[in-house]
Amino acid sequence: MEIALGPLENGGAMTIRGGGEETAGCSQAAPTAGLGDGSQEPAPRGRGCSARRGAEPGERPLPPQPPELPQSRRSPLEEEEGEGDPGLSVAEEQTLGAGALHHQRVLINISGLRFETQLGTLAQFPNTLLGDPAKRLRYFDPLRNEYFFDRNRPSFDGILYYYQSGGRLRRPVNVSLDVFADEIRFYQLGDEAMERFREDEGFIKDEEKPLPRNEFQRQVWLIFEYPESSGSARAIAIVSVLVILISIITFCLETLPEFKDERELLRHPPVPHQPPAAPALGANGSGAVAPASGSTVAPLLPRTLADPFFIVETTCVIWFTFELLVRFFACPSKAEFSRNIMNIIDIVAIFPYFITLGTELAEQQPGGGGGGQNGQQAMSLAILRVIRLVRVFRIFKLSRHSKGLQILGKTLQASMRELGLLIFFLFIGVILFSSAVYFAEADNQGTHFSSIPDAFWWAVVTMTTVGYGDMRPITVGGKIVGSLCAIAGVLTIALPVPVIVSNFNYFYHRETDHEEQAALKEEPGSQSRGTSLDAGGQRKASWSKASLCKAGGSLETADSVRRGSCLLEKYNLKAKSNVDLRRSLYALCLDTSRETDL
């Protein structure tokens, strides 16, 4: 008669035979432990054990013990406690120890495609979905002894490689960017992995925008700098856009002939004709012309203030100046504010008004309109016209409130190399074809090309396929040169266009992606609160309200989810240290699953 007893504390086994012989601490044949993959591993022998021996004198014989019952396969709820993986018995776990358990294999089913890896591989990243036993428990199928995920199969090659390589994330070539990014979010690889993935794919990392430390300055800065931050910020943005549009419309209307003539008459009214004054003798007897009693100097400044265009311009400049000063005093960094191109445009948009106003005031000074200063006045008028032209740059102020203009500006900035190559190719073509058409038309008396520099204009409008027709070749040789010039221009312009379009698409999708992420963060119950996205993009609740009882692909009932959720929420703290409670919850899930199948 032979009775096999359970394992001893030193790792060996004990067998009691009917003949009075016993083997303590080990058996003749080393016991084997079944692994999760079906292989066998010899258990370590006890310390100081021999093959078979009788009871020595003075040694206390062991009392008889009941035979060891066969251990059933453990539930995943016991495994999630950190004591083993589904499919590993208690005796096997005690025999193998933590080191062997670390190398146990786990089966992952991705939409019918099975992957096999080790628990230690997944445990490298415990904060992820697959690395955290509590998170991946929701997807365990106890009947098939595997984890099932209804996700994109090709993407899991890159996800599994992330665990196997220790953190290197590589997107499979047959998976699109948005699909793989969605898988990264589902498996909860973290923000750091997402940022590395975006950098590897060529995405530019967005710099964090600083905010003022003072609460009042922060609120003012958000209102005037970020129109989407609040309702008041949107109202300020609408007012700013309206003022910009009014300023641009006024700038265009004041150049119409009817308005221009009226303004000139208002600013410089005609002086009534006065008869010539009689010469009078001065104190020294010299003749001098006495001023007429009725002649007066036209009050230019009051008449300028009465101009409706000047009033509208003054109102717009007051708003622009107020907005610029408020943003300057509320900005977090004065140096960064001064280097910002948009703020430079704001300054350029308002300083022509003050220069014009200063010129008007200078004309009011005595002797400001003397005849000896006609040349200086003409030069000042030319400079003033150029300064007034700068007002047209106010249209770029709209880019502060327009995402489309911002995308266009970023596209041009990113395509400066391609634009430089385009200008360089055009420059070469202009030199080449202007020289060729000049020599081709040199013998013709009626030619339009008197010199090579005169032919530059023709070469530019021909290569850009504009063709004004003011200058054209007459001879056969000149027409051949013109045809080659047009073909070369089309090819030169068409070559860098795809790169520019690609940059535009990149910045456009980047902006839309930012808007989607911002909307995702604003939604209640986002991933920061423990939720995730399933394959269809729908929200999945936290694990206490998720699928607790999926068995054999059957759908759990609402009652089973409710019962399991209540139990887990009620005993959540105890369940982490009470294996019996988790075992009872697992039995509850199996019972509800069987009821659903029936």
Curated annotation (Swiss-Prot):
Reactions catalysed: K(+)(in) = K(+)(out)
Principal location: membrane
Lipid attachment site numbers (S-palmitoyl cysteine): C331
PTM characteristics: Glycosylated. Sumoylated on Lys-205, and Lys-521, preferentially with SUMO3. Sumoylation regulates the voltage sensitivity of the channel.
Gene Ontology terms: biological process: membrane hyperpolarization; membrane repolarization during atrial cardiac muscle cell action potential; Notch signaling pathway; potassium ion export across plasma membrane; potassium ion transmembrane transport; protein homooligomerization; regulation of atrial cardiac muscle cell membrane repolarization; regulation of heart rate by cardiac conduction
GO molecular function: alpha-actinin binding; delayed rectifier potassium channel activity; outward rectifier potassium channel activity; protein kinase binding; scaffold protein binding; voltage-gated potassium channel activity; voltage-gated potassium channel activity involved in atrial cardiac muscle cell action potential repolarization; voltage-gated potassium channel activity involved in bundle of His cell action potential repolarization
Region feature Disordered, mapped onto this chain: 1-89, 517-539
Chain positions of cross-link Glycyl lysine isopeptide (Lys-Gly) (interchain with G-Cter in SUMO): K205, K521
Selectivity filter, short sequence motif: residues: 465-470
Membrane-traversing stretches: 232-253, 309-330, 342-362, 381-401, 417-438, 480-508
Annotated compartments: Cell membrane
Superkingdom of this protein's organism: Eukaryota
Intramembrane bits: 453-464, 465-472
Topological region Extracellular: 254-308, 363-380, 439-452
GO cellular component, one term: voltage-gated potassium channel complex
Pfam families in UniProt: BTB_2, Ion_trans
Keywords: Cell membrane, Ion channel, Ion transport, Isopeptide bond, Lipoprotein, Membrane, Palmitate, Potassium, Potassium channel, Potassium transport, Transmembrane, Transmembrane helix, Transport, Ubl conjugation, Voltage-gated channel
Topology relative to the membrane: Multi-pass membrane protein
Family matches, as InterPro entries: BTB/POZ_dom (IPR000210), Ion_trans_dom (IPR005821), K_chnl_volt-dep_Kv (IPR003968), K_chnl_volt-dep_Kv1 (IPR003972), K_chnl_volt-dep_Kv1.5 (IPR004052), SKP1/BTB/POZ_sf (IPR011333), T1-type_BTB (IPR003131), VG_K_chnl (IPR028325)
Keyword Ligase belongs to the record: no
Signal peptide range: none
Domain topic, free-text comment: The transmembrane segment S4 functions as a voltage-sensor and is characterized by a series of positively charged amino acids at every third position. Channel opening and closing is effected by a conformation change that affects the position and orientation of the voltage-sensor paddle formed by S3 and S4 within the membrane. A transmembrane electric field that is positive inside would push the positively charged S4 segment outwards, thereby opening the pore, while a field that is negative inside would pull the S4 segment inwards and close the pore. The amino terminus may be important in determining the rate of inactivation of the channel while the C-terminal PDZ-binding motif may play a role in modulation of channel activity and/or targeting of the channel to specific subcellular compartments. Interacts with UBE2I.
Assembly information from the UniProt record: Homotetramer and heterotetramer of potassium channel proteins. Interacts with DLG1, which enhances channel currents. Forms a ternary complex with DLG1 and CAV3. Interacts with KCNAB1. Interacts with UBE2I. Interacts with XIRP2; the interaction is required for normal action potential configuration in the heart.
Protein task: Voltage-gated potassium channel that mediates transmembrane potassium transport in excitable membranes. Forms tetrameric potassium-selective channels through which potassium ions pass in accordance with their electrochemical gradient. The channel alternates between opened and closed conformations in response to the voltage difference across the membrane.
Family from the record: Belongs to the potassium channel family. A (Shaker) (TC 1.A.1.2) subfamily. Kv1.5/KCNA5 sub-subfamily.
Record's protein name: Potassium voltage-gated channel subfamily A member 5
Organism name: Oryctolagus cuniculus (Rabbit)
Gene: KCNA5
